Amino acid sequence: METRGERVHLPVFGVGTAYVVALFTTTALASVAVFFWLGWAAVNLNWLRLIFVVAGVIVAALAVVMWLVSVFGARVTENIENNQLITGGIYAWVRHPIYAAFLFLNAGILLVQANYVLLILPAVYWLALTVLMKRTEERWLRRQFGQQYVDYESCVNRIMPWPPR
């Protein structure tokens, strides 16, 4: 599909940018809410609080690694601009690793705060990302790449990384 000599491709900064901004804004507001209003839902057992904090740090660190591998390892900008479907490397483990990395980073930030109420937000983030991807990028990718993308999405998880099938 060509337009005036230029290839039609996904924007480098697409709907995901709005998702990421909303994600960080929600996480920041939730953090403020913990400080002012949600102290009653804090994890009070020291050993359990430690588990939350350690898990949060690990999840956030893995998210940063996932983002770095997704962006720099897969040369994502170059592939988008050249209208190439990326299916190797980390993209063999997860279809949307950049968005997943931001989701996991924010989940890690929420876990570190060790507050029971905040545990609902990663599920909300996952649901929002699923709906957003199904209604935008994945529709476009199916139209653009046809059966190649249909085969790819049948083998690779949308958000949760999993070894290739």
What residue spans do the PLM features occupy?
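Membrane-anchoring alpha-helices and their flanking helix-loop junctions
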Residues: 1-88, 102-165
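Short, amphipathic, aromatic/basic-enriched membrane-interface segments that mark the entry/exit
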Residues: 86-96
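Short active-site segment of divalent metal-dependent hydrolases/proteases
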Residues: 99
